[in-house]
């Protein structure tokens, strides 16, 4: 964890932003894989609890009494049975000292703390829960049914957390750079191992092992597939075939729980064919345009629309699209090929803070999502960029047979899409290129000391040498 002063400072700023009431920040509990007495999923602490307290043990709740400036770490010390099986851990009091919290209390006192606050008509702030055990706790403590908890969550607290966590400190940037360094090794390992005859599972398993070997974990389930048209195509036992493209979307999460997230698409046999190169070069140029346009004050929605126009122009040159570019993009015809947004915030969550509500993280009062239009409704980030933001730049082009068939049968966007030509690409798959960007004072830069090869010649050269 960082120094205790880091967490003291973060909580002090949180109190200023929320102004009054009592804040509950729930840590996560262990999650049993089959039954509670034996076998848990790998523990992952709640990111907002980590941000303000830095403690990675299960069964903790942070309570911040804003009005009286009192902070309490709630939790129970483990008993001898736990010590026998899992070893000794720090006491709750010792953990409180690590993050600069003066007071501790056992879990049974949380009910009284919340009950007294409600009797005094004080606001009890909590974030939208995403785990069922947390929902049950909120129901028991505050009497709010789980189905009503998302709408009852504190907007003051949500806005404060988003404001603080959106702008990354140098400590956080350094951690993300560490994650990117591991991510580089993961991706270059995938490039080295990819060849005809090996399975997706083999490559994906080796990639995950790289993260584990650095004391890290994957920042999300690794995507490695020769069906790149499937957005979240997890590795299968399919054998890699010459002439196909392999798409690898993976990242690492450091021991301080900061993430990386990159995507590369490369030829299974190490050499792009002409048709693959034509599509790849469009995605490459869209990726580089986003890099050029992203800077403080620019709306990421405008960057997204800029790459959509470039993509449409280039697909028209290949005969896959037609008509007026502006009209095609306005109508959403480009979403046949790009049914998602350009990128998202990244930090302690790979899709940073989206559990708080995407509309509060990636948008603001000025920029709102278009929830009615296919493709655009998947835009995760549209707000104006600010110095210190960490975002992803991940354009792609996908040829999804089911989507092609559905749109063609309905006659959708027939003035903008050349369905006859498109039919010949049904076996193509998909291409995505993704990098992590830090918004700087006057532009942006790649995160990671070493850039994973993505220009076609660099990809081919790396694969041929390794």
Where are these regions (language model features)?
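Active-site neighborhoods and metal-handling regions in enzymes and metal-associated proteins
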Residues: 1-466
